[in-house]
Amino acid sequence: MGAAPSKIVETLLEDTNFDRDEIERLRKRFMKLDRDSSGSIDKNEFMSIPGVSANPLAGRIMEVFDADNSGDVDFQEFITGLSIFSGRGSKDEKLKFAFKIYDIDKDGLISNGELFIVLKIMVGSNLDDKQLQQIVDRTIMENDLDGDGQLSFEEFKSAIETTEVAKSLTLQYSV
């Protein structure tokens, strides 16, 4: 992958928070991460990004970056994903990304089981399953405004906006 095709760059300029120079610098970084020169980043390459492997949600983050569900992250998906976490990413974009981390089956709702799985990834063995299930049940009960037993994006957003979580969803990185 030499210079990014101009059509892709034009689309990225339109759809992301990056300018042309930033996209070019990120393209160079992408090419370094793509060690096998396949044109996409596989899970091992993704995990080699500084700071990513230490994040317990790294696997879920990669799955959300991988918009076409190919199992790899291509250049366009990489830039689009990073754009959300840039300082110029909107609060709503960041909340939608966070929601997708929890919405494992991509049905637009966070079920009790999905919330349990993601929180289990985050807390590991610090809580036993019974304690964690109580937290999950309480979280759903307190925030499920329509009573369907799941959290919609709007319910998730409402719950999160009362905290400082959205502000913390900005990554500092140099391009």
From Swiss-Prot:
Coiled-coil-forming residues are none
Q: Which residues bind Ca(2+) 3?
A: 103, 105, 107, 114
Q: What start and end residues bound the annotated signal peptide?
A: none
Name the Gene Ontology molecular function terms of this record: calcium ion binding; phosphatase activator activity
The Gene Ontology CC terms held by the record are: calcineurin complex; cell division site; cytoplasm
**Per its UniProt record, what PROSITE patterns does this chain match?**
EF_HAND_1, EF_HAND_2
The record's listing under InterPro entries reads: EF-hand-dom_pair, EF_Hand_1_Ca_BS, EF_hand_dom
Give the residues the record marks as binding Ca(2+) 4. 144, 146, 148, 150, 155
Task: Decide whether keyword tRNA-binding is in the record.
Answer: no
Q: State the Gene Ontology BP annotations.
A: biological process involved in interaction with host; calcium ion homeostasis; cellular heat acclimation; fungal-type cell wall organization; mRNA catabolic process; regulation of cell morphogenesis; response to endoplasmic reticulum stress
- Report the superkingdom from the record: Eukaryota
Output the SUPFAM superfamilies linked to this UniProt entry.
EF-hand
Residues the entry annotates as binding Ca(2+) 1: 34, 36, 38, 40, 45
Q: Which UniProt keyword terms apply here?
A: Calcium, Metal-binding, Repeat
Domain (EF-hand): residue spans on this chain: 21-56, 60-88, 90-125, 131-166
Residues engaged in binding Ca(2+) 2? 66, 68, 70, 72, 77
Quaternary organization:
Composed of a catalytic subunit (A) and a regulatory subunit (B).
Other notes on this protein?
A: This protein has four functional calcium-binding sites.
Entry similarity comment: Belongs to the calcineurin regulatory subunit family.
Q: Note the PANTHER family from the entry.
A: PROTEIN PHOSPATASE 3 REGULATORY SUBUNIT B ALPHA ISOFORM TYPE 1
**Protein function:** Regulatory subunit of calcineurin, a calcium-dependent, calmodulin stimulated protein phosphatase. Confers calcium sensitivity.
Q: What is this protein called?
A: Calcineurin subunit B
Question: Which gene does this sequence derive from?
Answer: CNB1
